[in-house]
């Protein structure tokens, strides 16, 4: 599991990204449970995620409308199979409107780069 904390801060909201290898819904559930076991992440407002599995794509907005679709589209564009990307948000009290999608893209890009580096053995 890779975890990239404090990637974006905007109007009180904070974003992080996580990623890892998964091949089934059960592994997705285990990944999300492991992430939530981290005290800081357990207190987050949203854990939006997407994964491309052999059985097909899966996503969940976790209350952040449209977020899962944005993450999934980026996974599909990259052709990333059997990986999950989770974008976590701690809501800061101010609605961000469409800016939140730019933050989701930024976090997803960072997670995908970290997953590529991990697969390549890069530091």
Regions flagged by a language model, labelled:
Residues 51, 82-91:
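Glycine- and acidic-rich phosphate- and metal-coordinating loops
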């Amino acid at each position: 599991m890779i975890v990239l904390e404090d990637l974006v801060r905007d109007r009180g909201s904070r974003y992080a990204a996580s990623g890892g290898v998964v091949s089934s819904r059960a592994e997705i559930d285990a990944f999300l449970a492991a992430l939530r076991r981290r005290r800081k992440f357990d207190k987050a407002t949203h854990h939006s995620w997407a994964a491309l599995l052999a059985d097909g794509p899966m996503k969940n907005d976790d209350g952040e409308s449209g977020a899962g679709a944005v993450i999934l589209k980026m996974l599909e564009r990259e052709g990333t199979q059997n990986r999950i990307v989770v974008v976590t948000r701690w809501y800061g009290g101010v609605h961000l409107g469409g800016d939140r999608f730019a933050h989701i893209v930024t976090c997803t890009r960072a997670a995908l780069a970290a997953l590529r580096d991990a697969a390549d053995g890069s530091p």
